[in-house]
Amino acid sequence: MNSLSTSTFSPVAFSLGLLLVMATAFPTPVPLGEDFKDGTTSKRPFTSPDKTEELIKYILGRISAMRKEMCEKYDKCENSKEALSENNLNLPKMTEKDGCFQSGFNQETCLMRITIGLLEFQIYLDYLQNYYEGDKGNTEAVQISTKALIQLLRQKVKQPEEVSTPNPITGSSLLNKLQTENQWMKNTKMILILRSLEDFLQFSLRAVRIM
């Protein structure tokens, strides 16, 4: 299998190409049971763990680049713990009940949690897209690639129709609230979002490896 590489393409061009490939490779899921009508076997494609794993690692690489850039530009490194501990963000987290840890692992429950969690992160990625002052190519790459990852994971969930989409009104309200903060707090929130997404994806990566 060819590995995901950005040696030739910019992060945005790579991610746009990746999203196009995912969109054309995976059709809209059919209702449960229709795959086997008329005695035919399912032609619905299945995502290999390797492809999902490589995509997660690609996103983690872009996040790492953004965190490094913010650290160098704004001195927003690990010394912001006091401010971060006082944040009022409700960022997605992975817990034992999500079935993604080795102890109590449940593949279906875990896939649902990862997919829904990434959907919940979308509003925060919109925030990064609006206010991140570094390399915009990285923010766009993270957002586009995360959407591609959601598509991949939906194909692995047995009942994708049960994957709930976050309330857009709630998301819009949160985004408006975040926009009213001063620049220092915006930068602090952005590094927190990046750290939280990185943690979530690290847990997801370990789970994908044992699926």
UniProtKB/Swiss-Prot annotation:
One of the record's GO cellular component terms: extracellular space
N-terminal signal peptide: 1-25
Record-level GO BP terms: acute-phase response; glucose homeostasis; hepatocyte proliferation; interleukin-6-mediated signaling pathway; liver regeneration; positive regulation of multicellular organismal process; positive regulation of receptor signaling pathway via JAK-STAT; positive regulation of receptor signaling pathway via STAT
Major localisation: secreted
SMART domains: IL6
Disulfide cysteine pairs (residue numbers): C71-C77, C100-C110
Pfam families found in the cross-reference section: IL6
Keywords: Acute phase, Cytokine, Disulfide bond, Growth factor, Phosphoprotein, Secreted, Signal
Compartment list: Secreted
Transmembrane region(s): none
Residues carrying Phosphoserine: S80
InterPro entries, A to Z: 4_helix_cytokine-like_core, IL-6-like, IL-6/GCSF/MGF, IL6/GCSF/MGF_CS
GO molecular function: cytokine activity; growth factor activity; interleukin-6 receptor binding
Role: Cytokine with a wide variety of biological functions in immunity, tissue regeneration, and metabolism. Binds to IL6R, then the complex associates to the signaling subunit IL6ST/gp130 to trigger the intracellular IL6-signaling pathway. The interaction with the membrane-bound IL6R and IL6ST stimulates 'classic signaling', whereas the binding of IL6 and soluble IL6R to IL6ST stimulates 'trans-signaling'. Alternatively, 'cluster signaling' occurs when membrane-bound IL6:IL6R complexes on transmitter cells activate IL6ST receptors on neighboring receiver cells. IL6 is a potent inducer of the acute phase response. Rapid production of IL6 contributes to host defense during infection and tissue injury, but excessive IL6 synthesis is involved in disease pathology. In the innate immune response, is synthesized by myeloid cells, such as macrophages and dendritic cells, upon recognition of pathogens through toll-like receptors (TLRs) at the site of infection or tissue injury. In the adaptive immune response, is required for the differentiation of B cells into immunoglobulin-secreting cells.
Quaternary structure and interacting proteins, as annotated: Component of a hexamer of two molecules each of IL6, IL6R and IL6ST; first binds to IL6R to associate with the signaling subunit IL6ST. Interacts with IL6R (via the N-terminal ectodomain); this interaction may be affected by IL6R-binding with SORL1, hence decreasing IL6 cis signaling. Interacts with SORL1 (via the N-terminal ectodomain); this interaction leads to IL6 internalization and lysosomal degradation. May form a trimeric complex with the soluble SORL1 ectodomain and soluble IL6R receptor; this interaction might stabilize circulating IL6, hence promoting IL6 trans signaling.
Family membership noted in the UniProt record: Belongs to the IL-6 superfamily.
Protein name: Interleukin-6
Species the sequence originates in: Lama glama
Lineage: Eukaryota, Metazoa, Chordata, Craniata, Vertebrata
Gene name of the record: IL6
